[in-house]
A protein has these predicted regions:
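A structured binding-face within diverse protein domains that lines the active/interaction site
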Residues: 1-109
Length: 109
């Protein structure tokens, strides 16, 4: 799955640091926010019916604004337009490859 005409895209996420009072350790945690699927991702991820909240390039800075209004946050978390995305099947052996293998995302033959 990819965003057309954007070699890299961003997903909305949250990050927090908190103190574990038992150990005194500062725990750094994050989560990728999901939203309802669009028609493309619903077809692919058809068991949980969710997709990551993808941000357009023009919305990336807005997402990072700590004073962003709730209505604007809700707008940013809507499903990404399916016409701006595409997908293809990759080879089944991708699980056996290392993450830095340049062929890991090659289209299935």
């Amino acid at each position: 799955i990819y965003v057309k005409d954007e070699p890299i895209f961003s997903m909305a996420g949250i990050y927090d640091e908190w103190l574990d009072k038992t150990t005194g350790e500062v725990v750094k945690s994050f989560s990728i926010i999901t939203t309802d699927p669009n028609s493309l991702t619903d077809y692919i991820h058809n068991t949980k019916h969710r997709m990551p909240a993808i941000l357009s390039m023009e919305d990336e800075e807005r997402w990072l604004d700590p004073k962003l209004a709730k209505t604007e946050i809700e707008r940013l978390l809507r499903p990404f337009p399916p016409e701006r995305m595409d997908a293809y099947v990759i080879n089944n052996d991708f699980l056996k490859k290392k993450a830095d293998d340049p062929t890991i995302l090659d289209k299935a033959s």
